Amino acid sequence: MDDLVAVGSRQYFFFLMMLLLSRGADFLSTWIATPNMVLEGNPLAKMLGWKWGSFINLVLCGVFGAWPLAAIFIGTTSVLVAARNFQAAWLMRSLGEENYRDWYVERLRQTGLPLYLFCLLGQTLLTASVGGALIYFTGDSLIPFAVGFGIVGYALAVTFYTLLALWRIRRAPAE
């Protein structure tokens, strides 16, 4: 599973294209949802901005295109993140970034923390269980293992960045 493919080979270009498409979908969905990155949950992505974030992503796609396990993991996680972004992007765009953030924060403040955390963990643990099952039952096959790993990675990312946003919101003074 740790085998690399030769840079410039057919397999390399397959994994490179897969990464470019999946990372591109993540970028597109993020741009539609939050063109000014007001709602971006990843502090590093927010700090890098669109220009540097795009450049670093292109470089990383070129590097990880030679490592199938990483390429499939990153690709799986990226398309799941893009799908999640697209789910609410229309609402974010129609309300505007600032108004959506204010609306979301108000909903959080009106919801009991235990209910919110239960729903978040319900969503992410159920998602991770699908990935975990793929990992567990995959045997020696690279593709289902990497897809399962990507699903678990997605669930962990959603949990981490959602809890990070929740922590920031709860420590900020109420307006």
Predicted regions and their residues:
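Charge-biased, low-complexity intrinsically disordered regions
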Residues: 1-175
